[in-house]
Amino acid sequence: MEQRELTAPCLTRFDRVAFGAAAGLLAIVFAYLLAYGLLRTSVFDPADPAGEHVFYVWDNAAVNLAMLLGWLVLFRLALHFQRRIRLGWLTGAALGVTFALGVAWVLVLRAVPVNDPGILYYTAAELTRGDPSELWRHEVYLRTNPFQAGYLQYSELLQRIFGRHSYVPQGLLNAAFLTAAYGALMDLTWRSLHDRRTQVALTLLLVLCVQPVCYTTFLYGNLPGLCLSLWALDCLLRWLTGGRRRWIVPALTLMALAVVLKPNYLIFALAAALVTALYALGSRRLGALLVCAGLLAAPMAADRLARLALEKRTGFPLGAGAPQTTWLAMGMQEGPLAPGWYNRYSLTLMERAELDPDTAFVLNRQDIAQRLSEFAADPAYALSFYHQKMVSQWAETTFEALLVNRVMPSESPFPALVNSLLSGGGSRALTLYMEGYTLTLYLGFAAGAGLLALRLFRCKAQAWPCRPPPPAA
């Protein structure tokens, strides 16, 4: 058989303390989010349903506790009868339901992209006609965010295939990407743990998670990038657990494409590189460090190639863009929505710098230094700022899944049911459902991280497996 047990290098006392402290910190954070979420919720200003102005409202703790208990009972029953459940049937049903919900959501809403997705979509539409003028019309945006070159050309390719203004086909493709991403998570979990109870719980958690389904109408790199990065991790895991070297090529390719479509997934590449480096050191197979380097180099090279390709075809100078620390600085700023949220800082920074990346870097460092000095001068303000930043995001349990659909127009009027789900009584029911689901996740994360921390602190080094098997040639 190709599959082998994946083990980890021996953990020293320092390793166990460091990893245990990290797990303990995560447990504390999610326990706080759970406690906060039972009492309060972050919501968007009801006077401006399409806006992103965050308010903090008190919840009915009894209702939230009842919902949490209901979710726990549901999963307890599922795990109690899990031996009667055929995993293959459950997996197929979960993936089928996810795809069907995504397709239905896209077909009913027929949403038209706006804001960042709209800029990229309509610019791509003009490129299909050989007209690069939209690039110049959005010069500040694109020269601030040159990493959008990958998704821009992806959107152009799809419009060449499906036709200009093909919102629905791209949404349907998003539904397929989401379904495939769920499939990757299921496969990763099974290959990592081979535990039936865990697999049943994960499958139920995925099929009951409706927030990503609502994002199928959001024509951006989120869902395609998520799918590709998860399958890249799956291919990497197949190699690490004794698979042939042929799995390395799709792992690097898929990870590179994921980062091209959505640069945020460089986090996945960094995590994969770290795991591979630990594997190489623990197994004393230093050749695996080449794979580690590839996991970092391939996405960066692919992103660079995407930018060069767009510049070569259109003559539009993307440049280096805003420095990466721009988004760090933005996250330190007050704004009209909530502390640390998007506030056009990146665009105004590049305008101040007259689109010169070197000048932008200097200005950005000054802005960061100024905010750090303000935080240092008033620690209470700094604590309040980051607390509001955290709860405004993590206690808003729809994760903007409904908001992104409220702000988009449609090719046709919404049916009454959709209007209800987006802003009426159905919206309140759906929001309550999402809140109960998310609180259950926070409880699981807090308990899981806490138990892991205790195990790490209590165990001895020899209690951990010491050497992974080498991959097959």
Feature annotation, model-predicted:
Residues A50-A66, V168-P169, L173-N174, Q388-P470:
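Membrane-interface anchor segments at the N-terminal boundary of transmembrane helices
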Residues L109-T123, R129-L157, I161-H165, A320, ...:
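Extracytoplasmic catalytic/substrate-binding loops of multi-pass membrane glycan-assembly enzymes
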Residues N145, A149, Q153, I161-A180, ...:
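Loop-to-helix entry region of an early transmembrane alpha helix in multi-pass inner-membrane enzymes
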Residues Q211-G225:
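Short acidic/glycine- and proline-prone juxtamembrane loop motifs at membrane-interface regions
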Residues M1-A104, A288-L296:
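Start-transfer (signal-anchor) and selected internal transmembrane alpha helices
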Residues L172-L193, W231, A447-G450:
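Transmembrane-helix motifs of polytopic, lipid-linked glycan transferases
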Residues L308-P413:
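Membrane-proximal stem/loop segments at transmembrane-domain junctions that anchor or position
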Residues W89, L185-L208, C227, K460-R467:
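Transmembrane-helix signature of polytopic, membrane-embedded enzymes
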